[in-house]
Structures are given as C-alpha cells and as structure tokens.
Amino acid sequence: MAGATSATAAAGAFAAAKARGPAAACPWLVAAGGRRRSGVVRCDAGGDAQAASKAASITALEQFKISADRYMKEKSSIAVIGLSVHTAPVEMREKLAVAEELWPRAISELTSLNHIEEAAVLSTCNRMEIYVVALSWNRGIREVVDWMSKKSGIPASELREHLFMLRDSDATRHLFEVSAGLDSLVLGEGQILAQVKQVVRNGQNSGGLGKNIDRMFKDAITAGKRVRCETNISAGAVSVSSAAVELAMMKLPKSECLSARMLLIGAGKMGKLVVKHLIAKGCKKVVVVNRSVERVDAIREEMKDIEIVYRPLTEMYEAAADADVVFTSTASESLLFTKEHAEVLPPISLAMGGVRLFVDISVPRNVGACLSEVEHARVYNVDDLKEVVEANKEDRVRKAMEAQTIITQELKRFEAWRDSLETVPTIKKLRSYADRIRASELEKCLQKIGEDNLNKKMRRSIEELSTGIVNKLLHGPLQHLRCDGSDSRTLDETLENMHALNRMFSLDTEKAVLEQKIKAKVEKTQS
C-alpha cells in the first residue's frame, strides 16, 4: 500500500541516517519538496526586563516585511506527522492516543503554536496522525513533534525513529489512502472511513478545522466512498473486529470453536462488530460486560441470532473466570487485566486447548502483555492481527492498485482547488479596486446631472450600467486568474497573470496577506 510504504520508508530512512547528524537524519526537514514551500521567522519575546521585552517586540514587528519579502513567493504547507501500525508498536501508539472528546483541545493547542495555522487529529487504534497547515515547514514540523513529545512523555529523538512526515500532495494522498482503507492493517476496512467522517463532524461542532484541512478531509471522504463504490476493495474485506474474531478461531481447537465460551468487555462500536462477526462464525451465545445495560440492550435488539447475556462491570473478573475467550474493547486508559488477575483465574479445559485467550483490540491496551507469562493464558493485541490479514496479500495489492486511479483523480481536484486559492486575494482586490473607481466616477456623474433631474428608475439604470461595464471589463482578466482544473491553463501561467495584475494595479496582495499572518502570530506571542 502506497501510504504504508511511504510511512515505513520515512521511518527507515531516519534510522539509517541518524548517526550522520540532524540534517542527514531529517532530510524531510530541509528538502524543497515541490511547489508549496513556506516559512516564517520565529518571533519569540525575549528578555526578563520590561525594556528587553519591548525591544524584542519591536525587533519582531520589524521583521514583518523582511519575512514577507523572503517568503512572498511561497505558500503554507500541508503536512501530516504521525505514526501507525506500520511504523510503531502498540506500546508507543497508546502513549500518543488522543481520546475523541479531547480532539478539540488538541487542535486548539496545535493551532496556538507559532507556525501552525490549521490542524486536525486522527487517532484510532492503528494510527495517531496530526494534519496541519504550517506557515513554515521546518519550524512547524519541529513544533508539532515537540508537542507530541510533551504530551506522550516520549523523547523527540525516540519519536522521530517511528514518525512519518509527508508534505503537500504526499500528505493529501496519504489521507485519501487512509480514508479509502488502503493504509489500514485490513485493506478496505470500513471503520476508518467513519473515523475520518468523525474528524469533520468533531471540527464542525467545535468551531471548524480551517479552510484547507476541512476541504481536504471532505475530499478524502469522497475518495473513500468512491473507492468502495467503484472497486470491489470491500468485497470480503475484514475489519479489526472481524480479524480479532478470526484470530481467536485460529487459536482455538477447530472442533471446539463453536462451543467456546465467549466474553466481550465493552459494548461500543468495536465491541458491537465483534458480536456481529461471532454470529457470522456460528456462535450462539456471548456474555457482554459493560458499564451500562442500555448499549447491550441496543445490540441485543439489533442482533437476534445470538443470545447476549449482560453482566455489569463489577462482575468482570467473575465473567472472565467463566470464559474461554475474552475480547476487550473499551476506552479505559488503564489495564483491566494484569498478570496477577490471570494467575487466579481457573484453568481452561484441555478440550479448549488449556489456554484462556485474551484478544485485546483497545488502544490504549486493556490487557497487559505480561499475561502471556502465565501458563494457561495468552494475550493478543492489534499488532498480532497481521497474522490474519497477511493472507491473500497478492489480492490486496491488486485491489490497492485499482483504487489508486480514483485516489489520483480526487487528489488532482483538491490540488486544483488549493491552487485556485492563491489567486482569490488578487481577484477580491481587483474587484474592490474596480468598484471603488466605479463608485467614484458614478458619484461625479450624478452630481453633474443633478439629483433633481433623476428619478429612482433612472438612477438605478445608471448604476446598473456602470456595474455592467465593470463586470464586462473584468471578465477577461478574472478568467485568466482562475485555476480550477476546468481548462488547460497551468498554475504557472495563472500565477504569472496574477503577478502581472498585482504590478499593474499595485495590488501587492500576497505580501499583504503574509504580513498579516506574521503580525497576528507575533502579537499573539507577545500578548
């Protein structure tokens, strides 16, 4: 899978170059990396004394025009910084996991960083990825990595050995592949698309993700839907939950699979899917432990082909004592089962293999890895599901190649939309410039004619005439400023036209916009 390959390659490249120093170890921090390059000098208030602080503030403010002159031909970068099941073990991923209800706070903290304009967090059991629009690629990446290090308690140097960092079209393609299920442990699984949708819903409920990130995620959803509708990538595809059930069946004696006593802890979305796939395997009964009975009742109402027995969370260990297989899928940030718990559980019958199976699909994990040290217990987590999904690898690669055509089409549409944003300030400035002239000349004309000589209809007709003339005159220039992928005009041609109009009418939009961004960030830092 393309995204996974890129991610793994990035992590590998860092490890190989680490000994040669920071520049060699982090080529993605210094490479030009395509058309969209941007940067901004970091503006920090310095000095403890008031005079020193004031001097630093003045110096920072004076750097506006220097920074704008240096970077006015450049553009903010879209970046993704993250790790996944392909690049990092679950022990690291669980430390970085951000609960869904904390996404808004994480976004707020990220966008408060000096060089980050927009941000989004995608945190699942298999990945933790941060998408940002950075005013400066180098500084933005460094700030995000430092934020991740601070939140997880993992040194930045250790994090970089597992992180992948992708820029602009590579970052966008990666998100589209994630949404389509191409970067999932289980190719084509549907839950990741729902999780990408939740990022957008979460952003809408908390004040928005920012123009670029919001559009990118919405286009990623479109790409994910198209891949599933126009290819057979989802045919026979398994989810993390179904892979967990399959793994349990593989480890049980074949003759006893259907008679095994099944226990599920957690009745959320993942847990519900576990029940669904147990039914598909022919299981007739499952015990579900959950904090409240309402969710269990809802599952029971929907799935009538299996007997579902509810037990409260306070009876979890008693329920585990009566189970051959224990599936855990909760949002608990602490372990539910440790080695000490497993040691006091009664042994399993030899007919069932003599081993109690714990299949933990939670991140952070619910079951300690040390359980496997107990003679009659074995624990499997999400990383162990690779054993299940490695089957049919050739078919997985073929399906991924079919889906890439759709991914490329949607990527081009997004890139065309983003390219068109470069000319929007110029279009607005040109329209405003023309309208000011129109209004001024119209006022002169009306004064010459005299208000007493005009009725409302005549005045409206003259105003409409002036507006029509301006629109006709602007139509040609504005057409040459549009770059939405609908014609053969290249971005370079469009930008050349934009710069020409800026010079002719002294619009100087790019520089003004960037100066405003720098000023806003500096004032925020100084306050």
UniProtKB/Swiss-Prot annotation:
The active site is at C125. Pathway: Porphyrin-containing compound metabolism; protoporphyrin-IX biosynthesis; 5-aminolevulinate from L-glutamyl-tRNA(Glu): step 1/2. Pfam families: GlutR_dimer, GlutR_N, Shikimate_DH. One of its GO terms (cellular component) is chloroplast. Gene3D superfamilies: Glutamyl-tRNA reductase, N-terminal domain (3.30.460.30), NAD(P)-binding Rossmann-like Domain (3.40.50.720). The keyword NADP applies. It comes from the Eukaryota. Keywords: Chlorophyll biosynthesis, Chloroplast, NADP, Oxidoreductase, Plastid, Porphyrin biosynthesis, Transit peptide. It catalyses: (S)-4-amino-5-oxopentanoate + tRNA(Glu) + NADP(+) = L-glutamyl-tRNA(Glu) + NADPH + H(+). The record marks H174 as: Important for activity. Homodimer. Catalyzes the NADPH-dependent reduction of glutamyl-tRNA(Glu) to glutamate 1-semialdehyde (GSA). Belongs to the glutamyl-tRNA reductase family. This is Glutamyl-tRNA reductase 1, chloroplastic.
